[in-house]
């Protein structure tokens, strides 16, 4: 039984590293891969206020510098966040 647990753990660890390598190349346009980012990424909705956010080490894609997530979760230039309306 302990051997099965060890083999299962090793398989999951290797699989996680293997899958993690593919995540880097699958980021959408205007996003980059990072191994550790905050749970609440900068967004157009949060631009006017600074929310309390706990930084967790979560790998994934984040908006590149100068871009924020819009209501459709797409990274857009900061200038497009409020097009057509005032702050």
From Swiss-Prot:
Site (Reactive bond) location in chain: 55-56
Signal peptide from the UniProt entry: 1-23
Tissue-specificity statement: Specifically expressed by the venom gland.
All residue ranges annotated as the TIL domain in the record: 27-81
Keyword Secreted among record annotations: yes
CC per GO annotation: extracellular region
Disulfide bonds: 27-61, 36-57, 40-53, 44-81, 63-75
Any single biological process term in GO: defense response to fungus
Keyword annotations: Antibiotic, Antimicrobial, Disulfide bond, Fungicide, Hemostasis impairing toxin, Protease inhibitor, Secreted, Serine protease inhibitor, Signal, Toxin
InterPro entries noted in UniProt: Ser_inhib-like_sf, SerProtInhib-TIL_Domain, TIL_dom
Protein location: Secreted
Recorded GO MF terms: serine-type endopeptidase inhibitor activity
PANTHER family given in the database record: RIDDLE, SERINE PROTEASE INHIBITOR 1 PROTEIN
Protein family membership: Belongs to the serine protease inhibitor-like (TIL domain-containing) family.
Record function comment: Antifibrinolytic and antimicrobial serine protease inhibitor. Inhibits trypsin, plasmin and microbial serine proteases but not chymotrypsin, thrombin and elastase. Inhibits the plasmin-mediated degradation of fibrin to fibrin degradation products. Also binds to bacterial and fungal surfaces and exhibits antimicrobial activity against fungi as well as Gram-positive and Gram-negative bacteria.
Protein known as: Venom serine protease inhibitor
